Amino acid sequence: MKEAEAGGRRRIEELDYLKCLLIVLMISFHLVFIGDSYPYAKQVVYTFHMPVFLVISGYLMNVQKSPDQYLRTLLFYLIPYLVMESGYTVMASLLPIREHIDQLTVSVFFEKLLLHPLGPYWYLHTMVVCGLAYFGVFHLWPFHPLSRMILLGLVFALLGYWGGVVSPTMAFYFLAGVVIRHSGVSILQVFRPSWLALAAFVWLAMYPVNLQSSAPGGILMAYLFVSFALAAYPVVGLVLRRPLLFVGRNTLSLLLFSPIFTILCKSLVSPLSFEPTGMLFLVVSLVICIAGSLIITWLMDLLHVSPLFFGKQRALISY
């Protein structure tokens, strides 16, 4: 396990690397042209990319912080979520996007904001809801750790199946990360590297029945993706370690701001249509989305907006 000191805490390099791969996949298939051109590949990626993100998030969320520190962390997930989801919802009522809202009323606005978010911001909504439940169970109930995790699972089931506040499947991926954290075992001891994981992943991906994150095959695909990615890291890292880790450490910025650029990149489809596979469009769009999101974050740091929006002086995390 490789660790790096960053901002006064220890970082696991492999997790930053995984987050880089996952955010690039997320942006790629939020490009409508790519999603429409490769629908099966999109379905495969959607089976595992956000579930793995949530496992990592559950593992990294430290409920042993003081209540003030922990709730401050959640607050600065909530503030960007409220700002960006509000903007996205209004935009969805004005632009002819896939999630277009025909008539935006006050009730529809708050239904999207509080219960059923649009765009990629549902991830932050899930993080805040699951994080609050996690805090409540682990701070307010003096149970044995195993009992707390069982209770947390029941709370997630209540919120998901009966309350409709979060996806129960995604909440349980978050719970998996929590369980790993409290097991006393490193996440890299749970997810072991293997080159053969690629063959098993491809075999499972050939059968549509596996392409659901709640299906046994989908859960296994998430594990196999991580296993193969970790096996490839020593090789890929020889050349691309610094840019991969830089992107991986700034996934929040990319999650928040990349939708602005995925919409703008629609205008590139026609000029780049001479390349029939769409790969040129994909590469150019990824550069624009990643660079644009990082530049916005850098400007927010420069203008001292980051303390209000992200809760820290510098939101752009350097290598």
Features from the language model and the residues they span:
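Alpha-helical transmembrane segments and their immediate juxtamembrane cytosolic regions
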Residues: 1-319
